[in-house]
UniProtKB/Swiss-Prot annotation:
A GO term from the CC aspect: plasma membrane
NCBIfam families hit by this protein: PRK09874.1
Main location: membrane
Family: Belongs to the major facilitator superfamily. DHA1 family. MdtG (TC 2.A.1.2.20) subfamily.
Keyword annotations from UniProtKB, A to Z: Cell inner membrane, Cell membrane, Membrane, Transmembrane, Transmembrane helix, Transport
TM stretches of this protein: 19-39, 56-76, 90-110, 113-133, 149-169, 171-191, 222-242, 254-274, 288-308, 317-337, 376-396
The species this protein was found in: Salmonella paratyphi C (strain RKS4594)
Protein name: Multidrug resistance protein MdtG
Record-linked HAMAP family: MFS_MdtG (MF_01528)
Length: 404
């Protein structure tokens, strides 16, 4: 029996990677509530300049992550996924530490770009688990894993706000670096992977990767679905607080109401993702994907007609429950339509599309709201998701006809 054939405890790996994704999600979102304040502290003054630099330092991380992800994915397929998890956690910890020492906005911008280049813990965690878990449990495992990052992202802003209030802005970066270093230690000591390194000559090139896919068109449609999921999520983010203020009128606790409405989809996804992932293992992830996309459309449209913040909160909770099924369903279908040999690159390509969606979504939402108002954003987003539902259904139908 070769080393790669030795059984490993994938359930323990799932638990540890869940903790790693939780810590990574929390670490990234810890600094988000006060990012514009830190930009201001670094010497940027004036409303327009502050808006421009805040947008730049936010989006540049996703942009550089989209560029770097395929490279790291290829390296993961050559050297193993565990070493990529270690590289990502340690690299991000060092960059976060340096961010707390930044003296001007250019240093901070470069470090935010470097954070994107060195990131990739969550897609590599997905690739690791996808290659270890039994195929018939992929939906449940990837759905469960997705709740780690969601949980961290939900708790991160709250913890970041509290820490910044007590200790100031710079110490939060040092605390975040410590959290990421803990993630590195957990990965180093507790994650097991049996991986035989592949030489550079043996690694498949992009054309060979595409040729090895069971259904290249379907995989491309899944990448597009990931992009549109993030566009739909991100398009609402820039206008949410302003829309809530328009609905609520003059109330003193608008920040609390907006924060609650912003977080309810994450709570719903946290509850629904493992259950819908398990259901997908039974009835097929493709059915879960199409139904969840259609439900998302049916929930986005009435959001443009709500009259109170609580109506919006209810619809966003239901939308979060549906969205909790989307990315795990996409990831499960990627597992079904690729091999372990190329899993790192497939998940990294998917991450690149996700990052592109993270950049373009807020830009789309801001442009639509500036031209047509807040309510139009929900209608246009619903149209984009509807297009994706039809496109995905057509791709899955072609696959089914090809099999028959």
């Amino acid at each position: 029996m070769s080393p790669s054939d030795v059984p490993i405890n994938w359930k323990r790996n799932l638990t540890v990677t869940w903790l790693g994704c939780f810590l990574t999600g929390a670490a990234f979102s810890l600094v988000m509530p006060f990012l514009p304040l830190y930009v201001e502290q670094l010497g940027v003054t004036g409303h327009s300049a502050l808006n421009m630099w805040s947008g730049l330092v936010f989006s540049i991380t996703f942009l550089f992550s989209a560029i770097a992800s395929p490279f790291w994915g290829g390296l993961a397929d050559r050297k193993g996924r565990k070493i990529m998890l270690l590289r990502s956690a340690l690299g991000m910890a060092i960059v976060m530490l340096l961010m707390g020492m930044a003296q001007n906005i250019w240093q901070f911008l470069i470090l935010r770009a470097l954070l994107g280049l060195l990131g990739g813990f969550i897609p590599n965690a997905n690739a690791l688990i996808a290659t270890q878990v039994p195929r018939h449990k992929s939906g449940w495992a990837l759905g469960t894993l997705s709740t780690g990052g969601v949980s961290g992202a939900l708790l991160g802003p709250l913890a970041g706000g509290l820490l910044a209030g007590h200790y100031g802005l710079r110490p939060v970066f040092f605390i975040t670096a410590s959290v990421l270093f803990i993630c590195f230690l957990l990965t180093f000591f507790f994650i097991r992977e049996n991986f035989l390194p592949v030489s550079k000559k043996e690694i498949l090139h992009v054309r060979e990767v595409v040729a090895s896919l069971k259904n290249p068109r379907l995989v491309l449609s899944l990448f597009v679905t990931t992009l549109i999921i993030q566009v739909a999520t991100g398009s609402i983010a820039p206008i949410l607080t302003l829309y809530v203020r328009e609905l609520a009128g003059n109330v003193s606790n608008i920040a609390f109401i907006s924060g609650m409405i912003a977080s309810v989809p994450g709570v719903a996804a946290l509850l629904s993702a493992p259950r819908l992932g398990k259901l997908g293992d039974r009835i097929g992830p493709e059915k879960i994907l199409i139904v969840a996309l259609i439900i998302s459309v049916l929930l986005l449209i009435p959001m443009s007609f709500v009259q109170t913040p609580w109506q919006l909160a209810l619809l966003r909770f239901l939308l979060g429950a549906a969205d909790g099924a989307l990315l795990p369903a996409v990831q499960t279908l990627l597992v079904y339509n690729s091999t372990n040999q190329i899993a790192g690159r497939i998940f990294s390509y998917n991450q690149s599309f996700r990052d592109i969606g993270n950049v373009t979504g807020p830009l789309m939402g801001a442009a639509i709201s500036a031209s047509y108002g807040f309510r139009a954003v929900f209608c246009v987003t619903a149209g984009v998701v509807l297009f994706n539902a039809i496109y995905s259904w057509n791709s899955l139908r072609r696959r089914r006809l090809a099999i028959e």
